[in-house]
Regions:
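Amphipathic alpha-helical segments of the small helical/lid subdomains adjacent to P-loop NTPase cores
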Residues: 1-2
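Accessory nucleic acid-recognition modules appended to NTPase machines
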Residues: 5-171
Length: 171
């Protein structure tokens, strides 16, 4: 949201980022579902874990099934009420809600030889790197994916249609 451009100190910036995160996740996603009378997004803990996973893996090829499996395998969804891995359908529903809120953007993979978009292993980018830093903490690792995130949004801003090209195993 251009926090650096307006000269906010880090403490005020974190308060602003917390407000943006809370508004998008709590109001725009969870409350919107309630107002619509839908019960698609019912688990705020799962939603937050998916947000954290996607934020930590921006620019990486991800399948919906790998999100649920990773959350369970790393013990991030340990809860007495929860039984097993969330279904791919459930995870996809939560990811779709995040995409509808414009918190994350998805980029599809394109098979150059087959000349078609593939349904799996797309990439996700967070709308603002400041939000990622707020969620995961400020760290200097993974600067390549953070830069890729910035480039993706700059290409969108300039009007380009962006997709991932794939030929055999090369991207």
């Amino acid at each position: 949201p251009g926090i650096a451009d307006v000269g906010l100190d880090q403490e005020k910036a974190l308060v602003l980022l917390e407000g943006i995160y809370s508004t998008v996740i709590m109001r725009d996603i969870l409350e919107r579902e309630t107002r619509r009378g839908q019960k698609r997004i019912t688990d705020p803990v799962l939603l937050k874990k998916i947000v954290m996973f996607l934020a930590d893996n921006i620019g990486s090829s991800i399948s919906v099934s790998s999100i649920g499996n990773t959350l369970v395998n790393e013990g991030l969804l340990e809860d007495s009420r929860r039984k097993g891995t969330p279904s791919s359908h459930t995870v996809q529903t939560y990811v779709d809600a995040l995409l509808e809120s414009y918190f994350f953007y998805e980029i599809k993979r394109f098979d150059i030889k087959g000349k078609e978009f593939l349904r799996t292993l797309g990439k996700y980018y967070i709308v603002d790197i400041g939000l990622r830093n707020y969620l995961l903490g400020f760290r200097n690792r993974d600067s390549g994916h953070a830069l890729e995130n910035v480039v993706y949004f700059e290409l969108l801003r300039r009007g380009y249609d962006v997709s991932i090209g794939k030929v055999d195993n090369a991207e």
